[in-house]
Amino acid sequence: MIFKQFFDNTSSTYTYLISSGKGREALIIDPVLENVETYIGYLKELDLKLVKVIDTHIHADHISGMAELRDKTNCVTIMGDKAPANVVAMKVADNESIKIENINIKALFTPGHTSESFCFLMNDRVFTGDTLLIKGTGRTDFQNGDARDAYNSIFNVLLKLPEDTKVYPAHDYKGETVSTIGEEKKLNPRLQVKSVDEYVNIMNNLNLPNPKMMDIAVPGNLNLGISLEKQKLSNGLEKKDFLMKIKDQNSLLIDLREKQEIEKDGKIEGGLEIPFTEINEYIKNNKAELLNKNLFFYCRVGHRSALAVQISKTYNLENSHHLIGGIKNLNL
């Protein structure tokens, strides 16, 4: 397995790249915009294909690199299901899985630092975002943070993991790179409290200044999605036109979501189910047949389908359209 930890000196942010090996698919957690070219250089060096990128929460101290990575690599952007509506292409709920090839990552809903914070568990390690830091915990005094929720997320979710589980946070300010659940139980000063009220009292009296980038980073990270206007420019169709045109005999309807999304949100009957991460290969292998078809893509909120139209055009498949706003726009 390839596991690479990157560090951003400006925001003290850790970014993680995961892959099962050279020439395989890759996933990135908590990328920083200014370091996107570094990530891409590493991907090229090891012949890796970036297919998914995750943010643990809406960051307040840096602009996320998710959108830039999406635009440069056609990867799927992912956050937990409490994130604002159209920030990312795919959302995962508590205990749902994110998969790339033989790697399985479990989403854990851990509100407290922010109301939408998630951690992500992969075998022997957990990516804790700003929820649990090394010998510290994430502040809870902005972005709908809540110290009581944070206590529950830490003590009743993260600290229930095996003690040898490695802890990889989104930040560190003292040069630490990794810890374990067992070490944090023993050595983290904020975890030595005797009650939730004691923890809440500590967190509510930190009196820290707001992050320097907060007024720029939060609005920026809330607008990472592909806007409806941009979706329209990518041969986007409003739902009435879309539902009418897919009835044509020469049309081919393609659902770009993953199986768990389809099971959760329903689907339009009669289409192919091809996850977005496989659509380039599908088009390449079936180009001759598809040249005579009108392609109609859809996904959850229109991000992946807009990108699928762009991919189709690289194969000269000009009769490609997609559903603006995705299946969420259909209110099934």
Predicted regions and their residues:
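Core dinuclear metal-dependent hydrolase active-site scaffold
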Residues: 17, 97-122, 160
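Active-site metal-binding loops of divalent metal-dependent hydrolases
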Residues: 31, 58, 82-83, 113-114, ...
